[in-house]
């Protein structure tokens, strides 16, 4: 599609509350790698980072949403409106958009933070008021159209909003960047949502169809009580579940699971597997090294694993662990990592051979 905009004062990225420094560090690093100057504006616990850059529209496609680890959503900021009149918030936004092209959709949002969550009612009501005003001005299609840029209004308080634009092909397809997943009653643990979200977020739809096929063979390292194993069985995979602890009986009853009582950190298969998944609580560098060994030895073709991050210097540790993994894997791999909504102080990594 055509560029979402020729202008922009910066990038607005949403994140998990408390991880603003990590996202700021990542944006600064990746923008520098791409040859763009800029600086991050943020405060801890805001749930967002504003990366100021005079060339934001050109920078945005260089920082692909799927490649950003700590960003739940990535938007190009058209304008910041810090002193809105509660009696008329619409007119300043229409003024800002006077020369803008038509948009295919409108999302009115807020950060997922202590200060942002109370704004959900305002966001919903304001969206209902702004949509007809935009359509009357010829700025919004009657029905959602993903071939056109998407307009975002992000409130950070009742009188302070960012007017932004996103490329639907290079941004999260969910409001606030949060996929709405439901924990089914039969899920052995809430960790099942992490793997569900990883498959949804880290793989494109066509990749999921090609790489997660029924009948594939997988290993789940540190499997108990069976949350990730259960997700794999729902993909109709045959799973070796490695853990000295017990699995839930209904997971075993699927007929697709073999439970091996062993230390998941040291076990390896006799024959190569299609998939390996791992959500073990261990130092991230040790996990990165062990995951690299799996690829170097040819024990799996694809993997999804979690890296538990330390309390300090989490962006530095993330870079170190991912570099360590790729250096030691012994083969070229596509590596994608995200701090998922259902992650906590951790990131989830996908590794797969280059196609």
UniProtKB/Swiss-Prot annotation:
A GO CC annotation given for this chain: cytoplasm
Residues at the active site: 308
Organism of origin: Stenotrophomonas maltophilia (strain K279a)
Single GO biological process annotation from the record: methylation
Enzyme class: transferase
Family matches, as NCBIfam families: PRK11760.1 (NF008734)
One Gene Ontology term of the molecular function aspect: S-adenosylmethionine-dependent methyltransferase activity
Location(s) in or outside the cell: Cytoplasm
Protein name: Ribosomal RNA large subunit methyltransferase M
Residues spanning the membrane: none
Enzyme Commission code: 2.1.1.186
Gene3D superfamilies documented for this protein: 3.30.2300.20, 3.30.70.2810, Vaccinia Virus protein VP39
Annotated function: Catalyzes the 2'-O-methylation at nucleotide C2498 in 23S rRNA.
Main location: cytoplasm
UniProt: S-adenosyl-L-methionine binding residues: 191, 224-227, 243, 263, 279
Assembly and interaction partners: Monomer.
Catalytic activity: cytidine(2498) in 23S rRNA + S-adenosyl-L-methionine = 2'-O-methylcytidine(2498) in 23S rRNA + S-adenosyl-L-homocysteine + H(+)
Gene from which this protein is expressed: rlmM
Stated family: Belongs to the class I-like SAM-binding methyltransferase superfamily. RNA methyltransferase RlmE family. RlmM subfamily.
Keyword terms of this UniProt record: Cytoplasm, Methyltransferase, rRNA processing, S-adenosyl-L-methionine, Transferase
């Amino acid at each position: 599609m055509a560029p979402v905009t020729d202008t922009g004062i910066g990038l607005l990225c949403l994140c998990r509350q408390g991880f603003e420094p990590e996202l700021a560090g990542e944006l600064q690093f990746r923008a520098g790698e791409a040859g763009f100057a800029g600086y991050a504006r943020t405060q801890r616990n805001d749930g967002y980072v504003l990366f100021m850059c005079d060339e934001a529209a050109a920078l945005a496609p260089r920082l692909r949403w799927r490649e950003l680890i700590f960003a739940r959503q990535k938007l190009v900021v058209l304008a910041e409106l810090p002193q809105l009149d509660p009696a008329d918030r619409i007119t300043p936004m229409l003024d800002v958009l006077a020369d803008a092209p038509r948009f295919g959709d409108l999302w009115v949002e807020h950060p997922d933070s202590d200060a942002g969550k109370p704004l959900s009612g305002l966001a919903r009501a304001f969206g209902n008021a702004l949509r007809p005003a935009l359509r009357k001005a010829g700025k919004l299609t009657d029905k959602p159209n993903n071939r056109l840029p998407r307009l975002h209004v992000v409130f950070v308080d009742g009188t302070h909003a960012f007017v932004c634009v996103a490329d639907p092909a290079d941004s999260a397809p969910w409001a606030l960047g949060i996929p709405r997943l439901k924990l089914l009653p039969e899920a052995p643990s809430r960790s099942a949502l992490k793997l569900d979200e990883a498959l949804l977020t880290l793989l494109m739809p066509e990749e999921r169809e090609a790489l997660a096929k029924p009948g594939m063979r997988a290993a789940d390292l540190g499997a108990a009580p069976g949350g990730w194993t259960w997700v794999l069985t729902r993909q109709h995979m045959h799973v070796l579940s490695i853990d000295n602890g017990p699995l839930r009986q209904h997971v075993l009853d699927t007929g697709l699971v073999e439970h091996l009582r062993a230390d998941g950190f040291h076990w390896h298969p006799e024959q190569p597997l299609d998939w390996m998944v791992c959500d073990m609580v261990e130092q991230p560098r040790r996990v990165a090294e062990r995951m690299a060994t799996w690829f170097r030895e040819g024990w799996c073709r694809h993997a999804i694993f979690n890296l538990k991050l330390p309390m300090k210097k989490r962006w530095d540790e993330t870079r170190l662990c991912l570099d360590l993994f790729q250096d030691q894997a012994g083969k070229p791999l596509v590596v994608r990592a995200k701090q998922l909504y259902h992650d906590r102080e951790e990131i989830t990594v996908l590794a797969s051979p280059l196609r």
